[in-house]
Structures are given as C-alpha cells and as structure tokens.
Curated annotation (Swiss-Prot):
Alphabetic keyword roster: Cell membrane, Glycoprotein, Ion transport, Membrane, Phosphoprotein, Transmembrane, Transmembrane helix, Transport
Misc note: Involved in the uptake of clinically used drugs including diabete treatment medicine metformin, neurotoxins 1-methyl-4-phenylpyridinium (MPP(+)) and iobenguane and platinum-based drug cisplatin. Metformin competitively inhibits OCT1-mediated thiamine uptake, leading to a decrease in hepatic steatosis. Plays a role in the anticancer activity of cisplatin and may contribute to antitumor specificity.
Gene designation per UniProt: Slc22a1
Name of the featured protein: Solute carrier family 22 member 1
Post-translational modification as stated in the protein's UniProt record: Phosphorylated.
Induction section of the entry: Down-regulated in obstructive cholestasis. Up-regulated by treatment with pregnenolone-16 alpha-carbonitrile (PCN) and by overexpression of pregnane X receptor (PXR).
Control of this protein's activity: Phosphorylation of the transporter leads to changes in its substrate affinity, resulting in a regulation of the transport activity. In contrast with human ortholog, ASP uptake is stimulated by protein kinase A (PKA) and C (PKC) and endogenous tyrosine kinase activation. ASP affinity is induced by PKC-dependent phosphorylation. Inhibited by cGMP, most likely through a cGMP-binding protein that interacts with OCT1.
C-alpha cells in the first residue's frame, strides 16, 4: 500500500500546489515578527524629563530655547545634556510661577548652589522628546514603572509557553487546518484589542492572549507545509519558511518608520492578518493528519486535487493510501525517559541550555539595538538583513560540515561579538552595529539549527516530548530577557553584553559535548540514542535519514 511520500513522488513533491501553499503560509510566518519583537517600536523609550507647572510659561516669557529651558529647570544634566536618573525622574521642588524668578539662571535667586535645592519625584507627568507615541509615552512607563515595559514583552513569551501546552494538542486532535484558522482568528482579534486597550492592565491581558495563540498559528503553518511537500524538499522548505519571518522583520522596520504612533502601528500589523481566514478555501487539511484519523476518503480526495493542480496523473492504487506506521511509537513516553541514561541526561541538559541561551541572545540583541541604537529604524533594519545570509550558511553547511561545529562556532562568534562591543566607543557606531549584526547572525543560525539537532538526538517514542520540553526553555528565556536587558542597563549599559557574552561562549563550549548527527540514522530506541557518537547504526539508515531531513519538530 502506498504512503503519502510514495504518492508525492508521482504527483509532485514540490509542484504548483505546494508552491502556492508555501507562499500563502509564508505570510503567516512573516506576520509573527511584529508580535515577537514589536516591543522595539511599541515600547520605545524616548528622552524624557519631569513636567513642571509654570515652566512652559516662564520659558515663553523669557524666550528660552529648549536647551536653555532644560539647563535652567532640569536637575542632573551632564556636560553634553546627557540623560541621567536625576534628569529623567526627579525635579526641583520649586514654584516656577513665582514672579521673582529671573530669566538668566532663575535658580540663582533662590540658592547659591543648585545642589542645595530639594528634589522630588515627577508628580505632574513627563515631557517626552518624540513626535510619535509608544506605550511608554502613553502610560508613563518610565522611572519607577519602567519594569512594566519588560512585563509587556514577557507576557508574549509567557503566552508562547502556555499556548504550546494546548495548541499542539488541538492540532493533533482537531487538525492542522482548523488549528491554523482558529489561532489566526484569535491572534487577529487580540491584536486589534491590544491596539484599542484603554489601560495598561487590559493591554497586558490582550498581549498575553495574543502570545498564547500566535505561535500556534506559526507552528500550524510550519507543520502544514512540511507535510504537503515530499521528503526531499522538507528541510529546505522549513528553512525558507523561517526566512519568511525575517522578511517580516525587515518589513516591520519600514512600517514602524511610516507609522510612529503605537496604536496605529499595532492596527497596521493586526488588521491584515484577518485575510488569513480566507485560507479556509485555499489551503486543504494535511493528508497525513487525515490518515492518522482514519479519514482515508478525504485524504485520497486531497491527494487527487494535488495531482490535478500539479498536472500529474494520480497512481492507480491511490485509494489504498496509508500512513506509515512506526511500532516504536506505541510505547508511552514519560518525562523521566529524557534523563534515563547518562548520555540522554547530558543531551537533555545541554539542549535545554542551548534553547534558553539562543532565545536570550536572539531577543536580547534585538532589544539592545532598540535601546542603544543611534537610528532605531536603520539599526533594526540592518541587523534583520543578516538573517538572510544566516539561512544561506545553514543550507550550505548542514550536510557538508554537519550540525555541531556550525552551532558551536555560531555561539562562540555571538558571545565574542557581545564582549567586543563593550570596548567599542560610541563614536564608532558603525563598528558597534557591525558587531551586533555578527552576533545576531550567529544567534539566528543557532536558533534554526538547534531545532534539527534536538529531533535527531532522541529515540522515536520520546522525540516529540524531548522537543516540547527542551524548546520550552526558549519561551522561558524569552520571559526573562526583557528584564535582563533593560534592568541591567540601568545598572551599567554594558552589563547585558557581558551576560550575553558568557551565555554565548558557554553554549559554544557545551555544544561540542554533543555527538555529530550528520548522516547518522535517527535513533529508534533509548539504547541507540545512548550510543550516538560511539558507533553508527546501519539499520534503516537510508529510510530514516530522510526523516532526519524533515525536521520532525514540525509536528510539535
């Protein structure tokens, strides 16, 4: 009886049908970018200082320039008007409406030295140095409330983590297509609700809801496209699908530049996603999932449609279509199996660390660019472009060099780039951007390749469990990253870079402790997984190597 892969070899592994589905689903991949890293623009913190009643009137009466107004009325400004905690979060406790104040150094008429003036917190809000708006300027998320910006982004990653526990079940129980449509609808609605949220708390809840479903939408699209194409195209298709996310990053920089108001920006990236609901008529259900649910008639009908669109004749035995069974998957997996043997324990711990560190490095470098860049939009744009050569490097090296050395080298490069950035003066901004781009490229390579290695190191019956548990550390890393970046920068601006450097270098060294899996048969049992790197299993090598190329993580 023919399997889906057997039929695809005859009706087209990547024909017109697959190309059309691929392009449509890539739009979903691109739409995740504003959700994943939109904090860079939505949560942009401009220069700010306390608003003082009477200062504007005094400035107008005296004819001060903005620089003179700041110099006379704002405490703690450096020699070059550099921002500090005092200048941004404290104010002179002075009645600026009193008529005795002079226009030339007005505070000198009150005290001989400004340092003798009492200071107090900003009680009347802030003045922001920006023509646009962000959640920071609208809800005054600065000074004592600055941590709420971190929480805004952490809620997205918390949503990713919670959603992964539910969405995978929905996709396996009710189908990839239904899961895609439902999560897309909720993602779109929650995105619009975020844009119109009346207060910070409701905005936070809508953002959490969006995180819970948006990654599920992305994964559903990933699973569908990898199940539509033949085995020879799955790996390349999966990498290109992830590249579509990079296209979304590049486009986000342009959209954010054109729309500096955060509410309109949020609407601009949310409203178009309602069009994905039209996929109900253009993207069919996965034949593989239908076969797993014993719905053979509908699976056969879809395979006939694929053959027709590809201009091929379906095989005569198509009605006997079946799903290839894997006897090893009849064994029930448990969390303890991930730590049952010495090598499995080692692999699990290392993979958890790799997932955690690559999430921190990838998101952390994006946020660091947003917080320190001279030109937010250009710096974000340039650092996003480097993800394209990163994908090319993966395609070139994955079968020629392997997995372990590229992952280790990429981690080491990222860590070294972060540490070098500490010693680069601000005047050499181009060099800082170059190093940030180099680190971003390394983090991108790791993020994409660790997914494949994770699937190749576990035996079949715990492969999906291993993928789910280890990749959960990616979402946990994302939860902590905003606090690591923004709160540590308040202590010392270079402190996050030191942390990133240590994480990257440690991850690079730990990666070398993993066995190379290039060309090695996918392990079927715990014994085979335990012996990876010691000897190559010859059994089923030809057929299982095809599974290695598919990246079975797509089913998680």
């Amino acid at each position: 009886m023919p399997t889906v892969d057997d039929v695809l070899e005859q009706v087209g592994e990547f024909g017109w049908f697959q190309k059309q589905a691929f392009l449509l689903l890539c739009l979903i991949s691109a739409s995740l970018a504003p959700i994943y890293v939109g904090i860079v623009f939505l949560g942009f913190t401009p220069g700010h200082y306390c608003q003082n009643p009477g200062v504007a009137e005094l400035s107008q009466r005296c004819g001060w320039s903005q620089a003179e107004e700041l110099n006379y009325t704002v405490p703690g400004l450096g020699p070059s008007d550099e921002a500090s905690f005092l200048s941004q979060c404290m104010r002179y406790e002075v009645d600026w409406n009193q008529s005795t104040l002079d226009c030339v150094d007005p505070l000198s008429s009150l005290v001989a030295n400004r340092s003798q003036l009492p200071l107090g917190p900003c009680e009347h809000g802030w003045v922001y140095d920006t023509p646009g708006s962000s959640i920071v300027t609208e809800f005054n998320l600065v000074c004592g409330d600055a941590w709420k910006v971190d929480l805004f982004q952490s809620c997205v990653n918390l949503g990713f983590f919670l959603g992964s526990l539910v969405v995978g079940y929905i996709a396996d129980r009710f189908g990839r297509k239904l899961c895609l449509l439902v999560t897309t609808l909720v993602t779109s609605v929650s995105g619009v609700l975020t844009a119109v949220a009346p207060d910070y708390t409701s905005m936070l809840l809508f953002r959490l809801l969006q995180g819970m479903v948006s990654k599920g939408s992305w994964v559903s699209g990933y699973t569908l496209i990898t199940e539509f194409v033949g085995s020879g195209y799955r790996r390349t298709t999966a990498i290109l699908y992830q590249m579509a996310f990079t296209v979304g990053l590049v486009g986000l920089a342009g959209v954010a530049y054109a729309i500096p108001d955060w509410r309109w920006l949020q609407l601009a990236v949310s409203l178009p996603t309602f069009l994905f609901l039209l996929y109900y008529w253009f993207v069919p259900e996965s034949p593989r999932w239908l076969l797993s649910q014993k719905r053979t008639t509908r699976a056969v009908r879809i395979m006939e449609q694929i053959a027709q669109k590809n201009g091929k004749v379906p095989p005569a035995d198509l009605k006997m279509l079946c799903l290839e069974e894997d006897a090893s998957e009849k064994r029930s997996p448990s969390f303890a199996d991930l730590f049952r043997t010495p090598n499995l324990r080692k692999h699990t711990v290392i993979l958890m660390y790799l997932w955690f560190s690559c999430a921190v490095l990838y998101q952390g470098l994006i946020m660091h660019v947003g917080a320190t860049g001279a030109n937010l939009y250009l710096d974000f744009f340039y650092s996003s472009l480097v993800e394209f050569p990163a994908a090319f490097i993966i395609l070139v090296t994955i079968d020629r060099i392997g997995r372990i050395y590229p992952i280790a080298a990429s981690n080491l490069v990222t860590g070294a780039a972060c540490l070098l950035m500490i010693f680069i003066p601000h005047e050499l901004h181009w060099l800082n951007v170059t190093l940030a781009c180099l680190g971003r490229m390394g983090a991108t390579i790791v993020l994409q390749m660790v997914c494949l290695v994770n699937a190749e190191l576990y035996p079949t019956f715990i492969r999906n469990l291993g993928m789910m548990v280890c990749s959960a550390l990616c979402d946990l890393g994302g939860i902590f990253t905003p606090f690591m970046v923004f709160r540590l920068m308040e202590v010392w601006q270079a402190l996050p870079l030191i942390l990133f450097g240590v994480l990257g270098l440690t991850a690079g060294a730990m990666t070398l402790l993993l066995p190379e899996t290039k060309g090695v048969a996918l392990p079927e049992t715990i014994e085979e997984a335990e012996n990876l790197g010691r000897r190559k299993s010859k059994a089923k090598e030809n057929t299982i190597y095809l599974q290695v190329q598919t990246g079975k993580s797509s089913s998680t």
